[in-house]
Amino acid sequence: MPGMVPPHVPPQMLNIPQTSLQAKPVAPQVPSPGGAPGQGPYPYSLSEPAPLTLDTSGKNLTEQNSYSNIPHEGKHTPLYERSLPINPAQSGSPNHVDSAYFPGSSTSSSSDNDEGSGGATKYTIYWGFRATDHHVQGRDSQARGTAAHWHGGHVCSPNVFWRISHGPAQQLTFPTEQAAPPVCPAPASRRLSAPG
């Protein structure tokens, strides 16, 4: 009948164990050269799937999906970290870095790190500054500063930035460095003299 809704299935009947899904694979049935009566023109036949067995071990759906089997110290640990084995001998590995080598490292948000400044250098990175920016030899500081300012504010394209910061110096002209057009003094006969 069209429009018929199947009855409600209780959640206990949906607990299908993973072992029951390992049914035998269905082997393709190739027809004999003469052809079997009643078989279609296709070489494979569809057979009924293996009946599914339902798990009635007594666990309900909420017990299976709960997080009660996670120890308390790992409940707030991300899954990718929880899946990694915890190895106490990790400190001997060559990639392990002890925190004693970083005396200035702290989780506090203090801007002036007074304690533990023994040898650790603090780098301040602000907007528009990239750690790969370096000073180019043979280029005046005004050209470098103007190029970095234009590039940081997205005023010029990366190609223009490269030409300003790395290109030949004789091709550079800045609006502040351009010579003013020559001003011709007025002829002496047209000069206005102060009244006197």
From Swiss-Prot:
Q: Where is the composition biased (Pro residues)?
A: 1-10
Q: Where is the composition biased (Low complexity)?
A: 25-45
Give the source's domain of life in one word.
Eukaryota
Q: Where is this region: Disordered?
A: 1-118, 176-196
Q: Where is the composition biased (Polar residues)?
A: 54-69
What name does the UniProt record give this protein? Putative uncharacterized protein FAM120A2P
